[in-house]
Amino acid sequence: MEWLEVAKIANTHGLKGELKLLASTDFPEQRFKVGNEVFLESNGIYTPFMISSYRKHKQFIMVTFKGMQHINDVEKYKGLKLYVHPEALQELGEHEFYYHEIIGCTVFDGEDEIGVVSEILETGANDVWTIKRPGKKDVLIPYIEQVVASIDVEAKRIQITPLPGLIEG
């Protein structure tokens, strides 16, 4: 089974077992909803944990796990990653994609390869993709209709029509 990473545990917060997460998932409010199950991976073993509280704090997601009400219960998890089953994903609408489907795709302008999507930034108005280019500076591509012409997640290929000045060097 292929597990999907949804967050990294950055630190603890306070003394009541709250964890500070760096989310790597889309829809964090659904993924970390109270009552949902996430899996903590340690040495290849995936242990289930039930979310008992969720809130946003600055750029972090703050959660507690059921039965873990003290910092001593959770401190050992700092630096570890949280995962979900692929079956936990919901169907998306047309032209909607999960981050894991976009990250790793190769981006092309016509037949010219630009690079590979390495990260997705949420900006509010639209997502922005970071494109890693070998030997060159990264490029930021807005996920808007005027730029992204087509996405083939099966082939891991994205076709764009860059706006003037979007890609330099």
UniProtKB/Swiss-Prot annotation:
It comes from the Bacteria. Residues 93-166 form the PRC barrel domain. Keywords: Chaperone, Cytoplasm, Ribosome biogenesis, rRNA processing. Its main location: cytoplasm. Pfam families: PRC, RimM. NCBIfam families: 16S_RimM (TIGR02273). The PRC barrel domain binds ribosomal protein uS19. This is Ribosome maturation factor RimM. It comes from Exiguobacterium sibiricum (strain DSM 17290 / CCUG 55495 / CIP 109462 / JCM 13490 / 255-15). The gene is rimM.
